[in-house]
């Protein structure tokens, strides 16, 4: 499954109303650690169809970033049944991100 670009317009449908566990990656194109995490998030999306993976560009979607209290990036959030069940800030390994999703 490919990564979905999350915006304020599709957030409710793609994230809050999703039956799958959702991994949200808050990032910016200029962020070095974000560029390290991005291919890991992409791989998880392809290798684990049981999860929905979305990315939120904080420069384009500052309202969503504010709603989630994102102060530093990359910020990863795990959402299950419309509730944040796990979150982390900073670059993480694939194993660490997969552990968050369990």
Where are these regions (language model features)?
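Residue-level signature of catalytic and energy-coupling elements of molecular machines
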Residues: 11, 24, 41, 57, ...
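A short beta-strand-turn-helix
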Residues: 3-22, 62
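Conserved Rossmann-like nucleotide-binding pocket used by diverse enzymes
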Residues: 2, 7, 27, 54
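Non-catalytic, surface beta->alpha helical segment in thiol-disulfide oxidoreductase systems
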Residues: 80-102
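Short pre-active-site segment immediately N-terminal to redox-active cysteine/selenocysteine motifs
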Residues: 19, 26-30, 72
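Conserved helix-turn-beta segment immediately C-terminal to the redox Cys motif
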Residues: 19-21, 38-56, 62
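Structural micro-motif
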Residues: 62, 68-77, 95
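Conserved redox-active cysteine motifs that mediate thiol-disulfide chemistry
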Residues: 26-40
């Amino acid at each position: 499954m490919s990564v979905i670009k999350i915006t304020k317009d599709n957030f409710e449908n793609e994230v809050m109303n999703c039956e799958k566990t959702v991994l949200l990656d808050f990032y910016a194109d200029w962020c070095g650690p974000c560029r390290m995490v991005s291919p890991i998030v992409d791989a998880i999306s392809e290798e684990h169809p049981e999860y929905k993976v979305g990315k939120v560009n904080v420069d384009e979607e500052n309202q969503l970033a504010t709603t989630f209290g994102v102060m530093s990036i990359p910020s990863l959030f795990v959402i299950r049944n419309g509730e944040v069940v796990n979150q982390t800030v900073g670059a993480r390994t694939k194993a660490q991100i997969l552990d968050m999703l369990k």
